[in-house]
A protein has these predicted regions:
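Non-catalytic accessory segments adjacent to catalytic cores
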Residues: 1-9
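Helix-start/capping segments and mature chain N-termini
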Residues: 1, 14-17, 21-202
């Protein structure tokens, strides 16, 4: 195990179909694997604020689809938008909903949170957002510590007017957000430093 504060042990379960079949049909048998590996910070620089870009041309999932399922088919389409964002100097992409193109859904493969007037906001689970374990843990931890948490539709406009923001996931843990850019508009948080509530939850 990595020393406390310097890394984590990442556990990744993998289930894949196998057997003598080539067509599009359920596999007759399955293989279950578990990868275990020590890891460092998901984003370069460790627990430092990251800059994100809102994608206005790509969507991670659509209503009625499998966006709420942890499957490779939900990650592969995001590789191109992520690569484009990184080539422009951003750490990752923020995806908006495919229906109204106004509400934040996810940050690459991480869940999104923002803080306004001491209240913690996160996009509600609508079937297009992955119900992350870290997301669930943070919501419970925040409420246990007397922090109000609201699960709702979070518009990009609202998020960009928030006091602080961060994303979270099994690999990302908690990554503070320093700025969000949408088109020609850029919102900055805490002068590039992790916010008070973000730090407390971390």
């Amino acid at each position: 195990l990595p020393p406390s504060g310097r890394g984590a042990m990442y556990v990744r379960p993998l289930l894949m179909g196998s057997g003598p079949i080539l067509g599009v049909a359920p596999a007759p048998s399955y293989r279950f694997l578990v990868y275990v590996t020590p890891v460092g910070p998901y984003f370069k620089g460790g627990v430092t604020a990251i800059d994100l870009l809102i994608s206005e041309e790509h969507h991670r999932a659509a209503p009625g689809g499998s966006g709420g399922v942890k499957a490779i088919g939900n990650y592969a389409p995001g590789m191109m938008p992520s690569k484009k964002a990184k080539s422009k100097g951003y750490a990752e992409v923020i995806y908006l909903d495919a229906e109204t193109h106004t509400c934040i859904e996810e940050v690459g493969a991480a869940n999104f949170f923002c803080v306004k007037d001491g209240v913690l906001y996160t996009p509600e689970l609508t079937g297009t957002i992955l119900p992350g374990i870290t997301r669930d843990s943070l919501i419970k931890l925040a409420r246990h510590n007397g922090i109000e948490v609201i699960e709702t539709r979070v518009t990009a406009e609202f998020a960009m007017s928030a006091d602080e923001a961060f994303c979270c996931g099994t690999a990302a843990v908690i990554s503070p957000i320093g700025s969000i850019t949408k088109g020609e508009t850029k919102a900055e948080y805490g002068e590039g430093e992790p916010g008070e509530l973000t730090t407390k939850l971390y």
